[in-house]
Regions:
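Class I SAM-dependent methyltransferase "Motif I" SAM/SAH-binding loop
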Residues: 53-60, 66
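Class I S-adenosyl-L-methionine-dependent methyltransferase module
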Residues: 68, 72-142
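A short glycine-rich, Lys/Arg-flanked "PGG" loop and its adjoining helix->strand segment in the class I
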Residues: 177-193
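Conserved SAM-binding strand-loop segment of SAM-dependent methyltransferases
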Residues: 140-151
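Class I SAM-dependent methyltransferase Rossmann-like catalytic core
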Residues: 2-49, 61, 68-69, 81-92, ...
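A short acidic, Gly/Pro-enriched loop at the edge of an enzyme's catalytic core
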Residues: 150-163
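Class I S-adenosyl-L-methionine
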Residues: 203-249
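Residues lining the SAM
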Residues: 165-169
Length: 249
């Protein structure tokens, strides 16, 4: 897959000292294609006919929306395989908990993507409902696959583009450096082109402390990396994306 054109980088914001979100476990929380387009700097039109994987996709509507735009999208998540009722309950529980935290810690958020918390919640809940409707129809057609990092159930180079949002770095307190390294290598393994990971900060909005070391070790393994500033920031510090590709690819 040819590298996608990068627009000029916007100004970066500075992290602020605030109490982090309480994330004792990975939340089942998702976003829309429009939000993915901004946080990953994607042009959906350019992706038509491409094979795209959304890793740790949760209840994001990206795959449903992308498929409607003739993008060959697949989503993978450890909770896929659960019944529709089970996932619906999980969405209700995790969304209620997450938005209660979001409203309680307004200094952790920026209103660049949404004008206010109500708009953000409405958009995210609409994305989840679209996911649930698509999951009910297409789970058995392998659009939604059960799997988890750092071991994905796909052959080498299956996808032109691999995306992973709000898992790596955000849950650094839960997953150690070795897990992050293994996860990055696995994402690259299943990609024939690029990997894009967003964001590069933790639940406190601070940059991932091990990023420089991670990039060095990936380079030693033949994986090139680039930090891409993006025109997106909902969570403070979430204004950059990591792009990975095999060197000379």
């Amino acid at each position: 897959m040819p590298a996608l054109a990068f627009p000029p980088s916007p100004l970066r914001s500075s992290a602020i000292a605030v109490s982090p979100l309480d994330l004792p476990a990975v939340s089942f929380f998702g976003r829309s294609l429009a939000e993915y387009a901004r946080c990953f700097t994607l042009d959906p039109v350019a992706l038509r006919g491409r094979d795209v994987l959304d890793v740790a996709a949760g209840p994001s509507s990206f795959t449903a929306e992308a498929t409607a735009r003739r993008i060959a999208a697949v989503a993978v998540d450890p909770l896929y395989g659960a019944t529709l009722d089970e996932l619906t309950r999980r969405v209700q529980e995790d969304y209620s908990r997450m938005f209660a935290q979001i409203r309680a810690k307004p200094r952790l958020f920026r209103f660049k993507t949404f004008p206010n918390f109500a708009a953000a919640e409405s958009d995210r809940r609409a994305a989840a409902q679209r996911f649930l409707a698509d999951y009910e129809t297409h789970f058995l057609h392998n659009r939604y696959v059960s799997g988890a990092l750092p071991h994905l159930p796909f052959l080498d180079g299956t996808f032109d583009l691999v995306l992973c949002a709000h898992l790596l770095f955000v849950y650094a307190a839960r997953f150690d450096f070795d897990w992050h390294l293994a996860a990055c290598r696995e994402l690259v393994r299943v990609s024939a082109g690029e990997v894009r990971i967003h964001p590069l900060c933790g639940a406190d909005g601070k940059p991932y402390a091990g990023l420089a070391r991670l990039r060095r070790e990936l380079r030693a393994a033949g994986i090139a990396s680039q930090v891409l500033a993006v025109d997106y920031e909902f969570f403070v510090g979430s204004d950059s994306t990591l792009v990975l590709r095999r060197e000379n690819s």
